[in-house]
Amino acid sequence: MKKIFVTTFNKILFDKFAKNLIESFIETNQQLPLYCYVEDDIKLYPKYNNVFFINLFEAQPENKNFFIRNRNKYANYIQKNYLFDAVRFSYKVFAQSDSRKYADHIFFIDADTLFLKQIPDSWFNVCLPNSVFISLYDRLGYYTE
């Protein structure tokens, strides 16, 4: 069964920290491909081996519709508490849904994460056996990014 890593970011977040995720992915010689869903033109990003950039709004037009409908809907609440920013969190959900067409097992990696060493293939099977489907958006302490 095919396995992939998936993440989301835009050009601003790429320049801020997602480029470090990709560099650590390459330096640690990860064996699974990394699918990066972005909100902007994929031509803005450098080319890397085993890293694929996908425009999220083209792959999932309903995500763009959701963005347009909701981008200003809760602006007052979002300024006070980012947890109300449904648009911000929708990118992860739409990317994970779209990525199912590329693999049977999807491992979502936040863009501000770093790989410290290569993850052995055996770990993936222990973490997510073939008979399991799980999605966890744990919010203990409310730190989300």
Write out the residue ranges for each language-model feature.
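N-proximal low-complexity "stem/linker" segments adjacent to membrane-targeting elements
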Residues: 1-19
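Short, charged/polar "capping" segments at the starts of alpha-helices
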Residues: 14-16, 40-47, 143
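Short, polar loop motifs at secondary-structure junctions
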Residues: 37-44, 117, 139
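Active-site-proximal specificity loops/subdomain of glycosyltransferases
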Residues: 43-100
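Short aromatic/hydrophobic "clamp" motif used to bind/position activated sugar donors
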Residues: 106
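The conserved acidic donor/metal-binding loop of glycosyltransferases
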Residues: 110-114
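Conserved donor-nucleotide/metal-binding helix-loop-beta segment in metal-dependent transferases, i.e.
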Residues: 115-145
